[in-house]
């Protein structure tokens, strides 16, 4: 499981589309608030690893490519803890 406090320090790239609270800033950006950390983690890894195509993959893949497994777990923990 990730560390939500550490995740808050790692969301710099995420906030442009998902905001600090995980609420998508435009309709095409999904809300991350309260999503399962497991789901978020697997989704971000799939984008990073090029396994997820279509939709927002063109945006998400480059954003996720620099993230380690630990970074992803921490970010997922952070957004899943938001209300």
UniProtKB/Swiss-Prot annotation:
Heme c binds at residues 14, 17-18, 63. SUPFAM superfamilies: Cytochrome c. It comes from the Bacteria. The keyword Metal-binding applies. Keywords: Electron transport, Heme, Iron, Metal-binding, Transport. One of its GO terms (molecular function) is heme binding. Homodimer. This is Cytochrome c-554(548). The lineage of its organism: Bacteria, Pseudomonadati, Pseudomonadota, Gammaproteobacteria, Oceanospirillales.
């Amino acid at each position: 499981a990730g560390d939500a406090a550490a995740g808050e320090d790692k969301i710099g790239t995420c906030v442009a589309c998902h905001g600090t609270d995980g609420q998508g800033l435009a309709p095409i950006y999904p809300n991350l608030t309260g999503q399962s950390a497991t789901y978020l983690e697997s989704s971000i890894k799939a984008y990073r690893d090029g396994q997820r195509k279509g939709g927002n993959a063109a945006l998400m893949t480059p954003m996720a490519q620099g993230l380690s497994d630990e970074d992803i777990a921490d970010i997922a923990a952070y957004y899943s803890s938001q209300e």
